[in-house]
Amino acid sequence: MKRRNFLKAGTGAAGLLGGALSPSLASAMAAARPKLVDTAPVEAISKGKPQHWLGPAFWGNRLQDWQSNQGRLECLQGGKSFEVRTAALLTRTLNNAHKPARIRARVGLLTPGSTGFCGFLLGVGAGKLEYRGAALAQRSSGQNGGFMALLNTEGELSFRDFSSPENTLAFTKIEREGSVGIDQIGDREIQLDCHIDPIDKGRFDVRLIASDINSGKEFGFAVYNDVPAEILRGGISLVSSPNSDEDGARWWFSAVESGGEKIDIHPEHGLGQVMGCMHSLNCAPEEPVLKLSAQFMPIDTTALPAARLEYRNENNKTWVTGADAPIGDGYVAAFRIVGWDAQRDHQYRIVDPGTGQSLYEGTIHRDPGNQSPLKIALYSCIIPTAKSLDETEFKNHIPEERVLGRYTEDNIFFPHTKLVTHCDSHQPDLYVFAGDQYYETFPTRYGRDTPQAKLDTLYRWYLWYWTFRDSVRNRPAIVLVDDHDVLQGNLWGNKGDATGGPREEDGGFKHDIDLVKMVYRIQSSHTPDAYDPTPIQHGIPVTYAHFVYGGTSFAMVEDRKFKSAPDYEANRLTVKGELLGRRQEQFLRDWAEMDPGLPKICLTASIWGSPQTDEEGNGLIDYDANCYPPDGRTRAVKLVEDAKALVLAGDQHLGLVARQYSGDFPVDQEQASGALFFSGPASAAFWQRWFEGFGKLENQYGDDPNTGNFTDPFGNNMRVLATANPKITHADFSDDNTSWGKFVSDRELKSEGYGIAVVDHAAGHYRLECWPWDADPQRDRQFTGWPQVHPIESLQQS
C-alpha cells in the first residue's frame, strides 16, 4: 500500500493522529501491506543453564542486568533508576541505504503485574559511533540516541524519543499516524515485529506490529511515518525497562531475527566465549617461561569448566598440547609453560577440551633480543566515557567545556579507536599498562558494594579488554594493578592490614577481599612469576617480579600494596613509613646485581614524587602521590638509581619526565645523576593535574618554562625535564570551577594519550616519546618537550 493511501485509511478511521484504529481496519491494512522482508536469526540463544554471557551477537548493559536462560534473554533488573536496560545486537547495524529492514523477537513479561515497556532501540550513534561504542547505550536519552519502538505492559504500542538531551528519562512519545493496542500483556507471549519501509524523498515509515506467536494473527500495531534517514542509522538494541523513576517490569526475549538490505551483518563483530588472551615471556637464560591467561566471558562453567592451551611453532603443522587449566574466579584460565622456545614464533589457540573446538587464536612472537630497538607502549588511566551514562543530566564543570553529546564520540571514548590505532602504528614489542584500567563510576554507577560486585567489575574490565584485545593478542603485555583497579580512589595498602578504620586513608583494602583477589587474578595471571610469592594479609597475592625480554632486564614493583597509611598529624618532612616495603626494597637490591650488561627498566604504577603545582606554581600536598612517606620514597629512588634503571609509570594523569634525587640536587646541574622517571599521560581521565613553572625554576631544560629543579611539599627533590600540561591553565580552570575536584570532561581541554619508550641497544640510549591520542605519528607532532633521548646508564656502567 502506498503511503498516501495508508495515511488516508488511517485518518479516515481514527480522525485524529494517534487515535486508535478498529481491529477490522487494522486487519485490512495489514493485508494490503507490501511484501514482508524475510528474516533470519541473529543468533541461536543458548538453551543451557543461566549465564551472563548472552551469546556472540549480544552485549548486555550491564552484565549483571541480563542472562541467557534456556533459549531466552532475560532482563534481571527492573529497579527504580534502572530504566532502559539494553542488550545490543553487536552483529547488526542500520546502514544509510534507502532500503527496507525488519527486526523481530518474541517477548514476554518476567514480572506479571508490574509496569514498564520493552522493544527495540534503533539508530544509536546515528552512524557516527563505532559499533562497540553504540553498544553501550542505556538508561538516558541524548544526542544521537535514536528512538525506541515499544510495547508496554498495558498493551500499548508506541514510538518514543531517545535522542533528547533534556529531561532524559521522559522518553517522549512520538506523534504517529495510527495505532491499535492489544490490552494487558499479563503472561502472554507476543511476537514483536518492527518493519522499516523506504518511502519518498529518502525517508521511511516504521511499523511496529504485535502478533500471536502461534497463529501469526495481528493483535495491534503502531506506525511512525516520514522518519528522517539520519535517525535510522547506527546501533540496534533490545530494551527492557520499568517506567521512569519506578520499580517495574522485567522482560524476556527469544527468537531474535533481522532482515533487509538496510541492516548490515557483521559476524566478525561477535564476542565469543573468550574475550581475549594476554601473555608474558620471561627470557632469562636459565629457563624461559611463558605465562598466558585466557579471559572468558561470564559463561556457564558447569558446561565448560576448563580450557586447553595448544601451540605450534612456525615450522610445524601439528598442534602441541600445552596444558589444561580450570576456568576459575573471574572467568580466567591461567597457563604456565617452563622451558618455552623463545627463539621461534608460535601460533597458539585456546581450545574446548571436550569438543576440540578452537575458541581463540593468536601468535606468540620470538624474543626480539637486542638486535633491534625494543619498543614499549605505555598506557594508564582510561575511562570509556567522558561522563557516566547513569547521569541523567550532563553539566559542564567549567564554562570552557563544550556541551558533550551523550551518544557522540565526545562522550563515548570506547573503544578508543584513534588512541589504539595510533599507538599500534609504532608496532610495539611490549605493552605496559601502568594501572587504573577502569574506574568505579565509568561508564556506570558504583557497583563495588553490591551483591553483583564481581560482575560489575568484570563489566568495566571487559570494556578495557575489548579496547586492547587485538593489541595484546600477539604481543606480550604487562598489567599493573593500581588503586582504582581494586575499586578505591586512593590506596595505602599497608600490607593488607585494614584494622585502622573504614576509610581509605586508614590503610588496607576496603572492599570484599574475594573481589580484590579476583581483580589480581584477571589482571595478573599472565604476568611473570612473583619474585617472592608470599601473599600479604588475607591471602592477597603479590605480583612484584623480575623478567628479561628484548635484551632488557625489567623489574615490576607494587608501589601501593605495602604503602603506609598517611599520618596527617606528623611532620610531613620527617614522618617515617613504607612505600615499597622491606620485601620489595630487598628485591630491588637483588635486581641491581642481576643481568649485568643489560638495560634496566623498572615498571611501577606512579611516579615517586609529587610534581604538581597550584595556580601560582606552588607545590600541592598530595598524600596519595607516591611522594609519601618521604623516607620510604627516598629509599625507593636510591634503589633504582643504584640499579641505573629507567622507571616507567602512570597514575598522575600528567605526562612527565623527571630526574628524581635521593638527596640534594647535584652540584653539577648538567650531570645526568638521579633516577630517570617517565610518567606517561592518562589515556582518558577525568581528574587533572598541572606542573607549571612559569619560567621561575632553576636549571630549566631546553628553555621550557615548565621545567627545572623542584622540591615537592614532602621535601623530595627532582628536576622536571618535560610536562604535558592540560591545554587550559590551572588558573583559568580554578577561576570557573564549580566542583570540589579538578574534573574536566572535554578532551579538547586536556592532554591525553600514550607513551613510547624505545630501548636502542646499538646506540646506547633510551628514546622517550609522548603522543596525543588523536595525533597521527606519520604526520603530527608529539607533546611539547618530547621526544627525549637519554643514555642507558647500565650499559655505560658495564
Predicted regions and their residues:
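Aromatic sugar-binding surface patches on proteins
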Residues: 327-336
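Short, aromatic/His-centered strand-loop micro-motif at the edge of beta-sheets
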Residues: 162-191
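Carbohydrate-binding surfaces in secreted/extracellular proteins
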Residues: 105, 183-223
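Low-complexity, Ser/Thr/Pro/Gly-rich disordered linker/stalk regions
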Residues: 32-101, 108-110
